[in-house]
Amino acid sequence: MSEFQLVTRFEPAGDQPEAIRQLVEGIDAGLAHQTLLGVTGSGKTFSIANVISQVKRPTLVLAPNKTLAAQLYGEFKAFFPNNAVEYFVSYYDYYQPEAYVPSSDTFIEKDASINDHIEQMRLSATKALLERKDAIIVTTVSCIYGLGSPETYLRMVMHIDRGDKLDQRALLRRLADLQYTRNDMDFARATFRVRGDVIDIYPAESDLEAIRVELFDDEVESLSAFDPLTGEVIRKLPRFTFYPKSHYVTPRETLIEAMEGIKVELQERLEYLRTQNKLVEAQRLEQRTRFDLEMMLELGYCNGIENYSRYLSGRPSGAPPPTLFDYLPADALLVIDESHVSVPQVGAMYKGDRSRKETLVEYGFRLPSALDNRPMRFDEWEAISPQTIFVSATPGNYEAEHAGRVVEQVVRPTGLVDPQIEIRPALTQVDDLLSEIHKRTALEERVLVTTLTKRMSEDLTDYLSDHGVRVRYLHSDIDTVERVEIIRDLRLGTFDVLVGINLLREGLDMPEVSLVAILDADKEGFLRSDRSLIQTIGRAARNLNGRAILYADRITGSMERAIGETERRRDKQLAFNHEHGITPKGVFKDVADIMEGATVPGSRSKKRKGMAKAAEENARYENELRSPSEINKRIRQLEEKMYQLARDLEFEAAAQMRDEIGKLRERLLAV
């Protein structure tokens, strides 16, 4: 299937039809770069969905962080339910790269926790690009990091057709080559089980289906997809393609060839270190590298095999690493969301990675070829990028220099105008803010507050909380999943005010927010630049009563430019509304729609329903508790369960238990 089927009950309106027409025209004309300058709430994602639907090209959508990537994934999934919308972000829940600190002679081993579900989604994303023309991949800057080369990856693929002549032992050996493991007890992703002539295989990239291969003697009699949970056969298949468990899986002959190259480099490096009288470094390098070589010979891989990626992919020294961009077809389209943030990120990745690895090489922890296991440099990324659309309300300098065409989308179909901006003195900002919060919460509206420092955010949160405000604080120490949950809770009304520093800006879709308060707006710098101010003010642009208050004792150049641009957009929207007789309407979005896919994109709906049912039963049980002794008993039971869940690494369920215990303790105080 190469047709993109856009499913929506809306028609393009306002500036959207013209923006879509110009972008499609630019793509067809072969423009390398275009910019969609779209204000908050103007439906930029909807316009891009229409462009993708019309040009019918595989598309990579690059977001600046996982939170926005999750939001975009959910939106594109809703727009294209019949197409391959995939999610490709870093699969690390926790990542500590290996590093050496010479000043204290401290070596830090690589330590990482891989999210199994996101690993599955990454494999699913590359499979979609290799097999389908109707793929939309939502990604972050992790797409410029090294990945196994597509040529090597495709050589490992295994095709099975119904009617094929296939020896069972040969099939099991091929599965082992793909790094699948046999497990007849616990049937999980990238495993297989054997029962007589029936082999069940759980594909590495699949979340919901496993494949059953039934043999009759040495012939494939039947191929079918089945539900691994219930065993129910979903459909019969004429053919199926199995992909490796990892992007780094390598054919045996390539591995042997790579090992020879590694041995040659090792000898050269050892000679160099010894001539420099670096005997400790030489001994360390030889020991570590020979251990890796032995692991590769015996198992086909080793820990940190990505450090030998130059040899595994057969690329010369200094060549760019294979990345997700190498999996894109020639006619692909690149959409960079919030490009004023995303583009600088691409350039920043290489330098930080390089300095750490140079230290490892210098002190004998890695061969010099490890330097080629790196993210792409900015110039390499520019060279490999397909036709690009930059999407931003505040395009940066790079977009201005490279925009073949700038398409404005300033008018909102809903008629909503940009928030009114008010400047108030900074001297009384906290007390004034408190009175404004009370006005908004009385109307069941939400408030965002941005400060300059972490300390000020914490102090302000404590102050507001002491004055009876339901407030939370969003900061960089909170992980991606919890950040999404906090934003969701704000929208649901669990609390009314969210305080932050630099996290309440690009792309966050919160129609319930009617007031944005910017403290110390006159302190020039990155957090109070004109782009930052426009983005922050824009968080209130989806609400009919949207307003922004800038607390400042003087008007800076950045404030002047931000206010001027916001007023220009207001005037254009008001003129459009007057001309077409439009009465502004607020935006109403189901919370689940926006956050679909954010926590664990594509996770089983059955699991969600099961958790919801358990929560309902818990709530019913808690309501039946009356006396303090009953509540105390229940708390002890839940604590035991919570600790057991934590020991089993079921942290999400343990957190739910912790919340239940907190509620019960509050009830205990009230009894």
UniProtKB/Swiss-Prot annotation:
Keywords: ATP-binding, Cytoplasm, DNA damage, DNA excision, DNA repair, Excision nuclease, Nucleotide-binding, SOS response
Keyword Nucleotide-binding: yes
One GO term of the biological process aspect: nucleotide-excision repair
Segments for region (Disordered): 600-624
Domain UVR: 632-667
Start and end residues of each Helicase C-terminal domain: 429-595
Biased composition (Basic and acidic residues): 614-624
A single cellular component GO annotation: excinuclease repair complex
GO molecular function: ATP binding; ATP hydrolysis activity; DNA binding; excinuclease ABC activity
Annotated motif Beta-hairpin, positions: 91-114
Subcellular localization(s) per the UniProt record: Cytoplasm
Domain Helicase ATP-binding: 25-412
Residue sites binding ATP per the record: 38-45
Domain notes for this protein: The beta-hairpin motif is involved in DNA binding.
NCBIfam families the record matches: PRK05298.1, uvrb
Main function: The UvrABC repair system catalyzes the recognition and processing of DNA lesions. A damage recognition complex composed of 2 UvrA and 2 UvrB subunits scans DNA for abnormalities. Upon binding of the UvrA(2)B(2) complex to a putative damaged site, the DNA wraps around one UvrB monomer. DNA wrap is dependent on ATP binding by UvrB and probably causes local melting of the DNA helix, facilitating insertion of UvrB beta-hairpin between the DNA strands. Then UvrB probes one DNA strand for the presence of a lesion.
Family of the protein in this entry: Belongs to the UvrB family.
Subunit structure: Forms a heterotetramer with UvrA during the search for lesions. Interacts with UvrC in an incision complex.
Record-linked PANTHER family: UVRABC SYSTEM PROTEIN B
Protein name per UniProt: UvrABC system protein B
Organism: Pseudomonas savastanoi pv. phaseolicola (strain 1448A / Race 6) (Pseudomonas syringae pv. phaseolicola (strain 1448A / Race 6))
